[in-house]
């Protein structure tokens, strides 16, 4: 029921009450008149007529009120009908509004979804364009960097060649000065000898004259005695000349014989010599593996270089990467590590550390096997196991570009051939020649020359004094006293002095890098040192408990200053100190 219905109902009720009240008043007035007046009284009759008229008027008013009430009821019913229709229309309007609102909301959501998808598409296009632009810029930068690195490398090679030519020219001039000095000394000695001979001839002429003067006054017996003495002196002189000729002939024959023995030994050995390289090539199953090796933002390649100390060069060469390091052991460990990672397919920092440990163990086994093969090739059976381990270290050690283990095998063969020609103890001399460079496996751990260190090691592990003396005397640090020591020297010189066996430029380069690592490794708190980029960068790994951030910067400055003071090198050397803290917890 709305407000209009309520007002209409109240009006009807009020009108009903008024009509009923008027009827009651009329009835009561009629009854009063009936009780107080007589029927034949004119006043009574007039009053009665007036009351009847009033009653009739009241009845007509009541009827009119009833009709009004009926009209009001009809109007109220019509109003209720209209209100119901209005409510139905309002309900339909609300339903229509709700339907329109739902449609608008669905349309808005669809528009929002389309706008969102379009925004995502445009964002993806922008990201793709940015990534392609970054890749193009990175490729251009890589090409520029590679060209600059190649140019720097070419300049370094030219500088090394120029330095080598300058060194050779200085050595030739020094050799020429020595030859001129020797020639001048020989001329002066010859002039002195000629002057002395002239004086001796003049003195002999004077003695002969005095002798003739004296003989002229001697008797026959005295002259005979003088003649006998002269003949004896002449015989002694001829005998001395004969002895001198025999000695000269023996010396000439001995030199010829020795030369024949050495040449025959070298010809019979004639081992091949391959120049040691500082770069290894690893072939990949496909170019997509290069991206996995690099890792996200270069994480894998940085971890690989910091753990192995080997430069990993990834360029446009199809299905291949380069590993560069001056240390052959490090380079071989890095090559095996990367090969195992590529075969396994799992390449991440933790896996790199695990595979690196396995590769180090495998390289140690390869060294042990190489030493055993060399012993079998030379023919040495009884030897201390510790010496076998030291010999295995020499598989990846070079001397002026010549592999030390191959040099020992070659020296042993040459010494054995020369000993057989001279009918000497072949096994002992081969053992001396094979062990003469054993000290090179410990020169980075023990102070002293490799000859003295090797002799001490051989003596400690039960080698004979002949072998020990040959080892310590093969560089004349101790004067050679036995034929074994002399033949060890000769075989060492024959193996190392052959054309193409050794290269001093590579050895100088390797020594410079080793000295750089020694300088940095001698500082307090340093754990590992790697010379990278052909010596142009030094990475120093420090222990975080011993070196803080301030000490790390001071350490880098000290290393750079000491390198500047002690070494001569082209260009500049960057010293990078890496301080890394690792905390590991196990969730159980």
Curated annotation (Swiss-Prot):
Keywords: Cell membrane, Endonuclease, Hydrolase, Membrane, Nuclease, RNA-binding, Transmembrane, Transmembrane helix. Residues 404-497 form the HD domain. One of its GO terms (biological process) is mRNA catabolic process. It comes from the Bacteria. Its main location: membrane. It is a single-pass membrane protein. The keyword Cell membrane applies. The chain crosses the membrane at residues 7-27. One of its GO terms (molecular function) is RNA endonuclease activity. It is found in: Cell membrane. InterPro entries: HD/PDEase_dom, HD_domain, HDIG_dom, KH_dom, KH_dom_type_1, KH_dom_type_1_sf, Ribonuclease_Y, RNase_Y_N. It is an enzyme of class 3 (hydrolase). One of its GO terms (cellular component) is plasma membrane. Residues 278-359 form the KH domain. SUPFAM superfamilies: Eukaryotic type KH-domain (KH-domain type I) (SSF54791), HD-domain/PDEase-like (SSF109604). It holds the Pfam family HD. Its EC number is 3.1.-.-. The keyword Transmembrane applies. Endoribonuclease that initiates mRNA decay. PANTHER family: RIBONUCLEASE Y. Belongs to the RNase Y family. This is Ribonuclease Y. It comes from Salinispora tropica (strain ATCC BAA-916 / DSM 44818 / JCM 13857 / NBRC 105044 / CNB-440).
């Amino acid at each position: 029921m709305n407000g209009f219905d309520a007002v209409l109902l109240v009006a009807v009720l009020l009108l009903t009450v008024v009509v009923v009240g008027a009827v009651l008043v009329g009835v009561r007035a009629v009854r009063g008149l009936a009780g107080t007046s007589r029927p034949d009284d004119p006043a009574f009759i007039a009053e009665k007529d007036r009351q009847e008229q009033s009653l009739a008027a009241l009845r007509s008013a009541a009827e009119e009120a009833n009709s009004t009430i009926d009209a009001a009821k009809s109007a109220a019913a019509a109003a209720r009908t209209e209100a119901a229709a209005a409510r139905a229309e309002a309900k339909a309007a609300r339903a229509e509004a709700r339907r329109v609102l739902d449609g608008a909301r669905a349309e808005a959501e669809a528009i929002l979804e389309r706008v969102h998808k379009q925004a995502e598409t445009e964002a993806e296009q922008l990201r793709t364009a940015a990534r392609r632009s970054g890749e193009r810029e990175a490729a251009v930068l890589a090409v520029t960097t590679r060209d600059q690195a190649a140019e720097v490398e070419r300049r370094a090679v030219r500088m090394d060649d120029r330095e080598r030519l300058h060194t050779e020219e200085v050595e030739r001039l020094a050799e020429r000065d020595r030859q001129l000095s020797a020639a001048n000394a020989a001329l002066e000695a010859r002039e002195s000898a000629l002057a002395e001979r002239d004086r001796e001839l003049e003195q002999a002429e004077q003695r002969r004259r005095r002798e003739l003067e004296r003989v002229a006054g001697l008797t026959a017996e005295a002259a005979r005695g003088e003649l006998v003495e002269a003949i004896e002196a002449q015989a002694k002189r001829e005998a001395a000349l004969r002895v001198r000729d025999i000695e000269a002939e023996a010396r000439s024959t001995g030199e010829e014989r020795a030369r024949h023995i050495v040449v025959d030994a070298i010809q019979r050995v004639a081992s091949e010599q391959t120049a040691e390289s500082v770069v290894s090539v690893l072939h990949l199953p496909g170019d997509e593996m290069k991206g996995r090796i690099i890792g996200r933002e270069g994480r894998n390649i940085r971890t690989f270089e910091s753990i192995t100390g080997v430069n990993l060069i990834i360029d446009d060469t199809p299905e291949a990467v380069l590993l560069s390091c001056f240390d052959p052991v490090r380079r071989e460990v890095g090559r095996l590590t990367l090969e195992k990672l590529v075969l396994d397919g799992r390449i991440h920092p933790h896996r790199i550390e695990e595979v690196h440990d396995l590769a180090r163990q495998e390289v140690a086994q390869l060294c042990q096997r190489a030493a055993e093969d060399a012993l079998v090739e030379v023919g040495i059976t009884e030897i201390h196991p510790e010496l076998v381990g030291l010999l295995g270290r020499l598989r990846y050690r070079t001397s002026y570009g010549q592999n030390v283990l191959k040099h020992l095998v070659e020296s042993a063969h040459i010494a054995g051939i020369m000993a057989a020609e001279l009918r000497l103890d072949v096994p002992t001399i081969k053992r001396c020649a094979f062990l003469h460079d054993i000290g090179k496996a410990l020169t980075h751990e023990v102070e002293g020359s490799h000859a003295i260190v090797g002799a001490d090691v051989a003596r400690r592990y039960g080698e004979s004094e002949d072998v020990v003396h040959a080892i310590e005397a093969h560089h004349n640090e101790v004067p050679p006293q036995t034929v074994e020591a002399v033949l060890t020297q000769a075989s060492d010189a024959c193996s190392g002095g052959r054309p193409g066996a050794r290269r001093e430029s590579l050895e100088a380069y390797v020594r410079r890098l080793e000295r750089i690592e020694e300088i940095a490794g001698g500082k307090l708190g340093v754990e590992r040192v790697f010379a990278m980029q052909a010596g142009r960068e030094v990475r120093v790994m420090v222990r975080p408990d011993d070196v803080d951030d301030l000490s790390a910067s001071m350490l880098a400055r000290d290393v750079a200053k000491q390198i500047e003071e002690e070494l001569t090198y082209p260009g500049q050397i960057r010293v990078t100190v890496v301080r890394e803290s690792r905390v590991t917890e196990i969730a159980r």
